[in-house]
Amino acid sequence: MSKSWRFEALDTLFFRDGTPFHQGETGNILPGSVFPPLMLTMQGAIRTALARKQGWIPDKKGLPEKLRLGTTDDLGDLQLAGPYLRFNGERLYPAPLTLFGNKNGKGDWTLTRLIPGPKVDCDLGEGVRLPKLQKQIDGELLNLWVTKEGMESILNFRFPEAKHLIEPDQLWKNEQKIGIMREEKTKVAKDKHLYSLIHIRPHAELEVEVEVGGIPEDWHLQKTQALPLGGEGRFALVNVSDITDPLPRMPELTVSHDGQIRFTVTLLTPGYYQDMNQVVKEGPPQIPGTCVSASIGKAMHMGGWNLKENKPRPIKPLLPPGSTWFFEAKADQLAEIKGVHGSFKGEKTAYGMGQLIVGIWKEEWED
């Protein structure tokens, strides 16, 4: 049975992005943090905690095979979903990258949405339907977090209430830190070897949540523990409990007058795919119907540190949560569409990557 592991930062956290540390060159680009952290970071903390509970002591040989906790590249029996964010005890979701608008000084939102536009010929091909604004307003594509109720409104092609919209700076802040290099053997600070980087300081009520399954019930942590998490020697408190948050409900899918079911698929977690270009144009694999348009966020980068070989991991691109594709399908594909909601598509799905939820969209003439 899967359990919810909830990580609460004890101080700042550091989950390094792909930016290299300076080697004497000029410039103000600092190594930053990816937040929420990628599962490659979370799985290391979780697997280590599980192994320690079974009596394993860290050594250079890695985890014993008998524990069946896998490796960084193959999780064995372990099954993970997430990471998700929880704020004030409520799970949050990345808003689909279809919301567009602005917020005035009083805190009121003016919103519209992206929908597929008319066919055009462009560098992507002939007859491409690029996304357009449903209503012309000032603003920008919104990078927000939403509650379950807010997500259900968006999936139903409605606008969420303001109380269900949370901006990132309400959840965490970036904080610049200064460090100094030390000699590996003596631990003595090296003169003129200062470095700067960006940490994350989460709100006191913010937690990072991972669903952990595929292991015996009594392997889960039984009490609150402090575990190393991320880089720079940072720690987080971990609580394990039953999973209490089902996914946002899928809206009712209907067949339009022209015989088409119009639906969207949105990434809840980063997506990793072998053929990224094809996925951008045609949508994630194994989705019924035809992709007619998409709103995709800026690519993320997955890297990290290879502890076994003591070197950085190769940087690989990911599609960010919130990326949304617009699909059309035939009426007889209804059951297949329903099966997409909450499923994982693409590569590294055992790591929680590529989780999708289904919504609906309408042509302008359907309103």
Predicted regions and their residues:
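Conserved active-site/ligand-binding neighborhood in enzyme cores
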Residues: 1-367
